[in-house]
Amino acid sequence: MKPTLLLLAAGMGSRYGGLKQLDGLGPNGETIMDYSIYDAIQAGFGKIVFVIRKDFEDQFREKILSKYEGHIPAELCFQALDDLPEGFSVPEGREKPWGTNHAVLMAKDIIKEPFCVINCDDFYNRDCFMVIGKFLSELPEGSKNRYAMVGFRVGNTLSENGTVARGICSKDADENLTTCVERTEIMRIDGKVSYKDEQGEWVAVGDNTPVSMNVSSWWLFPPISPPQRRPSPRSTASGSKPGPTTETSGPPGR
């Protein structure tokens, strides 16, 4: 069974000033996610699913989905603020889409096989997809609720144009992820990688500290498990269920 690539593409692009997921940057107008999809296909992925917003469906079908017809199965699902599990409601005044868990939940009726989740607007490298594809392909038959995350060395994910947001990770001796705390301001200061903590102080970390760039593989049984049926907070995440990490050197940061 070939794994599926799930691309999170419902962002509003408020800082960028538009739908950067649709903007071409390659010599033939390729988008960032086109490169990820190509590398994932080379790594053995057999289907792609996009999570988008309904309001730009027509643009997305024309600019993105149409180019994959006849090459690989591709489907859309839609993230909406009010599409919430029972007992949840949208806070007054909220317009920003929910986080990763909610986006993944939107694909619950489409994905029935092992899958990998990525951001559509981050550039990864082929090694990333080879690593995660290998993990999924080597899981024993009948595996249930298995997860992994590709860790990148933070020093390789920085930008020359300002701070970046990354999940600072820690792991145990068996390579299990123990914590992942999102830091929204990371940059190099006086030659050292540093992030700003809750008190506004800069904290230095080693260049090889593993960080999350939102690349994770999921093998869920049932396909979307009950713990995922909750919106996820965007500020801080802590691993409640340890999972293995795999490490790659990492691409340039956005």
Show which residues each predicted segment covers.
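Conserved N-terminal catalytic core of the sugar/cofactor nucleotidyltransferase
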Residues: M1-G13, P27-V117, Y124-N125, F129, ...
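Conserved catalytic-core motifs of eukaryotic protein kinase domains, centered on the activation segment
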Residues: G18-L19
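Short helix-terminating capping/connector loops at secondary-structure junctions
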Residues: E69-I72, E141-N145, P244
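Active-site flanking residues adjacent to catalytic metal/cofactor-binding acidic residues
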Residues: I118-D121, F152
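Conserved core of the sugar-phosphate nucleotidyltransferase
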Residues: R126-S216
